[in-house]
Amino acid sequence: MGLEKSLFLFSLLVLVLGWVQPSLGGESRESSADKFKRQHMDTEGPSKSSPTYCNQMMKRQGMTKGSCKPVNTFVHEPLEDVQAICSQGQVTCKNGRNNCHKSSSTLRITDCRLKGSSKYPNCDYTTTDSQKHIIIACDGNPYVPVHFDASV
């Protein structure tokens, strides 16, 4: 009887661990392309210039968890238009790699910069709207944006 009980408990343990174990790993790792979309794409953009846009978006998009991301740019154009930049003029990235591309036209963007007096967890940003060319790094198959390099 003791062996049957042990076998039953062991089987139950294996079953429970089979359910619990996948959740122990946490969320699946975010791809570089998905991270680019989360951190830089806001196709709607602010309905009108708002000084609190960056504070709201940086928090909503998870860039103030654990620390305040010092600088970020949001692009207010359709994702397809930004992805198309990957087939436009190739330029050298800031890090020296050759997988960056410059947009052939200017795009609507918002630059967010952490204010000097701001300290985590109270991340406070300046919001600057503009129209500029952007430089993005592209990678993968399909060849898609994975890093925002600069705006010019």
Curated annotation (Swiss-Prot):
Transmembrane segments: none
PROSITE patterns: RNASE_PANCREATIC (PS00127)
Main location per the UniProt record: secreted
Signal sequence residues: 1-25
Active site: H40 (proton acceptor), H147 (proton donor)
GO BP annotations listed: defense response to Gram-positive bacterium; response to bacterium
GO cellular component: cytosol; extracellular region; lysosomal lumen
MF terms (GO), sorted A to Z: lyase activity; nucleic acid binding; ribonuclease A activity; RNA nuclease activity
InterPro entries to which the protein is assigned, alphabetical: RNaseA, RNaseA-like_dom_sf, RNaseA_AS, RNaseA_domain
Keywords of the record: Disulfide bond, Endonuclease, Hydrolase, Lyase, Nuclease, Secreted, Signal
Record region (Disordered): 25-52
Annotated localization: Secreted
Coiled coil: none
UniProt binding sites for substrate: K35, R38, K69, P70, V71, N72, T73, K94, R113
Expression sites by tissue: Pancreas.
UniProt cross-references to SMART domains, sorted A to Z: RNAse_Pc (SM00092)
Comp. bias regions, Basic and acidic residues: 27-45
Disulfide bonds: C54-C112, C68-C123, C86-C138, C93-C100
Catalytic activity: an [RNA] containing cytidine + H2O = an [RNA]-3'-cytidine-3'-phosphate + a 5'-hydroxy-ribonucleotide-3'-[RNA]; an [RNA] containing uridine + H2O = an [RNA]-3'-uridine-3'-phosphate + a 5'-hydroxy-ribonucleotide-3'-[RNA]
EC number: 4.6.1.18
Subunit description: Monomer.
Primary role: Endonuclease that catalyzes the cleavage of RNA on the 3' side of pyrimidine nucleotides. Acts on single-stranded and double-stranded RNA.
Family that this chain belongs to: Belongs to the pancreatic ribonuclease family.
Protein name (Swiss-Prot/TrEMBL): Ribonuclease pancreatic beta-type
Biological source species: Rattus norvegicus (Rat)
Gene (name only): Rnase1
